[in-house]
Amino acid sequence: MSTSTATTSVITSNELSLSGHAHGHGHAHQLHQHTHSRLGVGVGVGILSDASLSPIQQGSGGHSGGGNTNSSPLAPNGVPLLTTMHRSPDSPQPELATMTNVNVLDLHTDNSKLYDKEAVFIYETPKVVMPADGGGGNNSDEGHAIDARIAAQMGNQAQQQQQQQQQTEHQPLAKIEFDENQIIRVVGPNGEQQQIISREIINGEHHILSRNEAGEHILTRIVSDPSKLMPNDNAVATAMYNQAQKMNNDHGQAVYQTSPLPLDASVLHYSGGNDSNVIKTEADIYEDHKKHAAAAAAAAGGGSIIYTTSDPNGVNVKQLPHLTVPQKLDPDLYQADKHIDLIYNDGSKTVIYSTTDQKSLEIYSGGDIGSLVSDGQVVVQAGLPYATTTGAGGQPVYIVADGALPAGVEEHLQSGKLNGQTTPIDVSGLSQNEIQGFLLGSHPSSSATVSTTGVVSTTTISHHQQQQQQQQQQQQQQQQQHQQQQQHPGDIVSAAGVGSTGSIVSSAAQQQQQQQLISIKREPEDLRKDPKNGNIAGAATANGPGSVITQKILHVDAPTASEADRPSTPSSSINSTENTESDSQSVSGSESGSPGARTTATLEMYATTGGTQIYLQTSHPSTASGAGGGAGPAGAAGGGGVSMQAQSPSPGPYITANDYGMYTASRLPPGPPPTSTTTFIAEPSYYREYFAPDGQGGYVPASTRSLYGDVDVSVSQPGGVVTYEGRFAGSVPPPATTTVLTSVHHHQQQQQQQQQHQQQQQQQQHHQQQQHHSQDGKSNGGATPLYAKAITAAGLTVDLPSPDSGIGTDAITPRDQTNIQQSFDYTELCQPGTLIDANGSIPVSVNSIQQRTAVHGSQNSPTTSLVDTSTNGSTRSRPWHDFGRQNDADKIQIPKIFTNVGFRYHLESPISSSQRREDDRITYINKGQFYGITLEYVHDAEKPIKNTTVKSVIMLMFREEKSPEDEIKAWQFWHSRQHSVKQRILDADTKNSVGLVGCIEEVSHNAIAVYWNPLESSAKINIAVQCLSTDFSSQKGVKGLPLHVQIDTFEDPRDTAVFHRGYCQIKVFCDKGAERKTRDEERRAAKRKMTATGRKKLDELYHPVTDRSEFYGMQDFAKPPVLFSPAEDMEKVGQLGIGAATGMTFNPLSNGNSNSNSHSSLQSFYGHETDSPDLKGASPFLLHGQKVATPTLKFHNHFPPDMQTDKKDHILDQNMLTSTPLTDFGPPMKRGRMTPPTSERVMLYVRQENEEVYTPLHVVPPTTIGLLNAIENKYKISTTSINNIYRTNKKGITAKIDDDMISFYCNEDIFLLEVQQIEDDLYDVTLTELPNQ
């Protein structure tokens, strides 16, 4: 492939996926006496659009002795045959950023149906019945078909070949072709991916414009006449002659393996005929053999396809005729007037300009196509090779559209059994998962016996009841493999474990290209300190239900060429260090491969029942460095050993030999999977290494993480899931069965296991990694875990983004806190398998879902206990003052609701400019300084409010997830250092509040309640915080503790259910410290901008600066807040009478003492009672540490005071209260009302001339500002539009209204309201006093 920006190549076929079939055994070398190569780019594209999914069976194979070698049924260059086109909702966005005015044809269709036809049929391997006739010789088996080209070459050799093939299963051929317009990807000669950008018809020829991974544009021509070949095309074809591979086995027979290009047709073109737009079909090869005898005569008539073969030197060219069925191109699909004007690269973008109309476009980068799926499609993932034969252990299944079979094939199809049903099966009415179950879920017949090794099969293990049967088959396989290995040490021995009843043998080049096909998106850099070259290999078996999350569907043993016979491709170089002739284990690592040696590389894929992704696992063929490469026999006793190179399993182009390859393990339901030889599934991002999906979209901490080991991890808890990584080495020790559980073991057992690992290290000197202690629950068969590294998740802290940033929906931070939080934890709703938000995008917190494993004494437990301290004996709970330390462990993530409607609150102070987006916004305020809080409401059509007056409780809370006891201790600690017992934590300015209805209630020392009408206008209240953030630090020099200003709004003032909850994170400084802190951060921000050289913009790292702080909407409405009032103050209130002082109802089931009554009264504020046994002793309110009492209240009306109330109702009848003991209270006592003095509120009654009913104006505070706000609330006249307010008394004297007049002379007076407009949007208001009626 040229390295220029524009490369032109030629494909001389409209059938780009055509490949030949070679069925030879004894005379395979005679069949392939010439090496072949297809001219132009190695295309062989076997990827279909959703118009028709038709499988192609390709490849060549050779058979020798008792060992069989079958080529992988890949496209000519190793590309998997089938995939889907549409994007999955879970797949990442394409890296190709901008497409402007693009004309791209056939990238996808807009049809809702999967296929063009109404019915979709699933077939077994089509058994083509052809009589023994014609040039093919006598065919003793009618179920065996021979390609016409092969039959023409074989002559009399066919009979001998067929007799030798009768030793194995018959391998019928069924080539199902598809049109050129179904091709959606081009692959280069070395397996590099080429992304199709456009396909045009120019001068009657197809031109495919593609772009490779290096950003180069390649123009591929598909010609129909060899005379149109360019001069440089022959040079390209000559350069590709060396792609053919030849391997010598012990029998001395020449066996040709498939190369990136097919062997049978080096040049495929059209001969004769005048129509250059002829599409060939392969229908006639399935007709009677009599027609093949007339192939030469048909070729002379015109329109025949000529298969040209030659030797490596380009001489001895032979042409083989073949029949064709001419067809016309669809003129609507391929229009000759389409062309592209300009294509250029702009950084990471590819911009395409065209003069034609824009078409539907879906272009994907890398290997994203392998994971694409849309509704109504059958999921056929990339990397799923389809077998060319029917193996003894299972039935390969193909899915084709109705009518996709060529003419002459349908009548030869024989009905078969697929999962107990006769094929073909009409699946047009089935769902996607049901069709996928047919496609991937065909099970081996119960009567099938394993007669050969190396047979091809694609077996899906998806039912639990077949485990026992498959284990028996595995034992039989292993015994036969071991025997055959001893008899034929040079043969390729399958090492298929349970979950695969066969193997697919592919060449190294095909395997390498398949790895390149499935590329993964570049993940964040792996910053771990672990060594990267773990030469570990072993067989692990996962036991127990629900232990692993994947199910193995395919196992491939790929024989690779030896060092001497390896093709000289730059991307395919495998260091062969194994000699299958040796049955003894080599521990020195110095064994070198002989010219006849082979290396078996394992290719395994995993899928899940009902899932949408398939996981490919294989070795990464690249040059092994150093003399310490793994060495050992391929298949020790037991037949379970698999040799892997010590490279990353990731096949993507971005993965190097020392990088980790990670696959996304999403939407994988837990369940008992089959046991497997090797497992590799890992989460894609670095911070997910310590968490595993819980099966329902959430995440639970992974109890263990296996590194550098071939170990399956099992969770003792049913349904548990573990995410781990696998690394592979080039050597195979004897199979060791290992099961790692999360059960806790004593330190002594861990030391013993560590000693055992050290002994293994001494025996295997080429393994240099230091083995860490691992946990081993029950070792099967007495074997020890092989290089398993367990890492606990509980003690780890990962700094993750929060949902606030928009990019941190996966934010989870494990905490060291181990106490049961009950209902006081922000994550009380975050149980395993439960998501916090409604759309399931925010994972749960770790606090409430860690493994419940008991901690005994002072052991270093691998998991963190959530069991109560009474059962543990010890806890690791942190003291409350330690929360002042701003380390990563203190960062918490609070589930939030993001919406633009409903209640919204703002703190009138700017936010910090140094807070990163992954953290919550924070606001700096000064102690004792009043700051405004604006309460607003935007109409929410989905959740409208019913009442005009709502109650909002503003309180100061701790941000950290403390227990209520710890919060009370912190407030008591602060209160004990104050000069007055009446010192409040949260104060409110009653005079300068706006838009409130009634008076401000002091619920507790750290909470107040206000009433306002959200349907009329917004409200504003000024609050001041009287404590410092550093007041809760245990020592000087520690950063202050962040606090929350939390607002709970109740739709009905009498309701106890929270309608909306919001919070704002603050830090409180003293002596203008907030301003100093803000200035320092601004200077640092300016300095960062001057020196910013990073890849990410600073604006993307930090929250944008705003003039006021918006409250976050919380999801958790159930957690009751902790309200604090000192016990000393409560004793005085209790002496006056608790029932009347609090104005709340008693709990009729309480024990009668004052403490319990007052306790229940405050709980009734939020609708919680303590009569239930499970809440006693753990009250959500716990207002103090020693005695329970009610708070001191200045104003005790818990409901709006606009009801008819006598002014003297606030005078309490002391005799009535003291004469009745509290224990005699039966039903709840009537609530006593207490009205504030007139100095803090004024009521005016006004009406206009055309009105008969007066309108009350609540003037709070009793000032002109309060009057302006009252007029604005009632008459919708803006306060800024009122120029003057006058009062005309009964004597006719008019005067301007001032504060004193309102406070002392206007209470409950009656006025006539007159509004006079003096200018545009400027009014004078006159209140004319009316005589009392």
From Swiss-Prot:
It is found in: Nucleus. Residues 59-68, 626-642 have a biased composition (Gly residues). Keywords: DNA-binding, Nucleus, Transcription, Transcription regulation. One of its GO terms (cellular component) is nucleus. Restricted, during embryogenesis, to tissues derived from ectoderm, predominantly the central nervous system (CNS) and the epidermis. Residues 520-532 have a biased composition (Basic and acidic residues). Pfam families: CP2, GRHL1_C. Residues 853-877 have a biased composition (Polar residues). Residues 899-1125 form the Grh/CP2 DB domain. GO terms for molecular function: DNA binding; DNA-binding transcription activator activity, RNA polymerase II-specific; DNA-binding transcription factor activity; DNA-binding transcription factor activity, RNA polymerase II-specific; protein homodimerization activity; RNA polymerase II cis-regulatory region sequence-specific DNA binding; sequence-specific DNA binding. Residues 52-93, 439-598, 617-655, 727-784, 853-885 are annotated as: Disordered. Residues 445-488, 533-546, 567-596, 749-772 have a biased composition (Low complexity). Signal peptide: none annotated. One of its GO terms (biological process) is open tracheal system development. Belongs to the grh/CP2 family. Grainyhead subfamily. Transcription factor that binds a CNS-specific regulatory element of the Dopa decarboxylase (Ddc) gene. Also interacts with sequences adjacent to other transcription units, including Ultrabithorax (Ubx) and engrailed (en). Activity in vivo may be required only at high levels transiently to activate the expression of Ddc in the CNS. This is Protein grainyhead. It comes from Drosophila melanogaster.
